[in-house]
Amino acid sequence: MNTPEHSQLGKASAYADQYDASLLFPIPRADKRAEIGIDGNAPFFGADLWTAFELSWLNLRGKPQVAIAHITVPCETPHIVESKSFKLYLNSFNNTRFGDASEVQARLRADISEAVWRGAPHPATVGVKLIAPELFDQEPVHELDGLSLDRLDVECTRYQPAPDLLTATFNEAPVTETLTSNLLKSNCLVTGQPDWGSVQISYSGPQINQEGLLQYLVSFRNHNEFHEQCVERIFMDLWTRCKPIKLKVYARYTRRGGLDINPWRTSHPQTMPKNVRTARQ
């Protein structure tokens, strides 16, 4: 079984100059999900929205081509792809010749799908969209919509996940609201390098205490876990402690190595958010 410790994270790595799909390093989701009480099917839907800003290859005449890639990985895949391995994989395209962008897109879709669905009884595919340079100026920047929790003047003293900070008002009428924060920070599971993010929480149900929610989000500050795992932990803590009727958690993390990862989890099927970067991304 692949584990994060066996990946290229935190290690000196050689950069392949020719296409090599074997560089992709899938890591099972199940182990970390078991830590937060998920055994078997997860109680949410969603996806991990990746943006690759450093994608380049050669055309058949050897001229470099560039594109931005939007990649959608369903959360029901049995694996995630470790991000440094994904960067190394993308770099292996740099000196490889392809007929056109559609050939690159098809190769990305096939390779990533194989990695994240590996061993699944009914494998499916990931979504891959390439943005050509002439469309770069149509890539928007927009902050997450919602009421900012960061306006609250709270005292913060806990910097490891503290779900006991989450409370809700169960004896009053349910509410529907969307709350945001730019204060999410966690650390890479293996290297301890800081990961900076913004988070949006939309729910219907007993009203969640906003001060406690902000303190809870801040409590991830010294926590070592991958982006996808942090968002699922937030979802499960809110789901079990605040008992919403509906819940959506969506985080957008700043890029590293030319990649950003933006996990989205929802209790009910709904339209996937557009992969639109924030100013910090």
UniProtKB/Swiss-Prot annotation:
NADPH binds at residues 83-84, 256-257. This is NADPH-dependent 7-cyano-7-deazaguanine reductase. Pathway: tRNA modification; tRNA-queuosine biosynthesis. GO terms for biological process: queuosine biosynthetic process; tRNA modification. HAMAP family: QueF_type2. The active site is at residues 188, 195. Catalyzes the NADPH-dependent reduction of 7-cyano-7-deazaguanine (preQ0) to 7-aminomethyl-7-deazaguanine (preQ1). It catalyses: 7-aminomethyl-7-carbaguanine + 2 NADP(+) = 7-cyano-7-deazaguanine + 2 NADPH + 3 H(+). Belongs to the GTP cyclohydrolase I family. QueF type 2 subfamily. Keywords: Cytoplasm, NADP, Oxidoreductase, Queuosine biosynthesis. One of its GO terms (molecular function) is preQ1 synthase activity. Transmembrane segments: none annotated. Substrate binds at residues 81-83, 227-228. Homodimer. The keyword Membrane does not apply. PANTHER family: NADPH-DEPENDENT 7-CYANO-7-DEAZAGUANINE REDUCTASE (PTHR34354:SF1). Its EC number is 1.7.1.13. It is found in: Cytoplasm. GO terms for cellular component: cytoplasm.
